[in-house]
């Protein structure tokens, strides 16, 4: 289920352009389904890759600070 959610994110983002390698690597390292579901929702709502990257980085930085 984790892999399917991750692939769903990548498929949604394909229409917006290329995912920056750094962000792709971070998303591939995620193992919590809740994190991937949150990013899936961000990807579904994103109107541009730039906006998705900004929101995803903000979320991931917040997660890193909590750990």
Regions found by a protein language model. Name each.
Residues 1-67:
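Elongated, amphipathic alpha-helical interaction scaffolds
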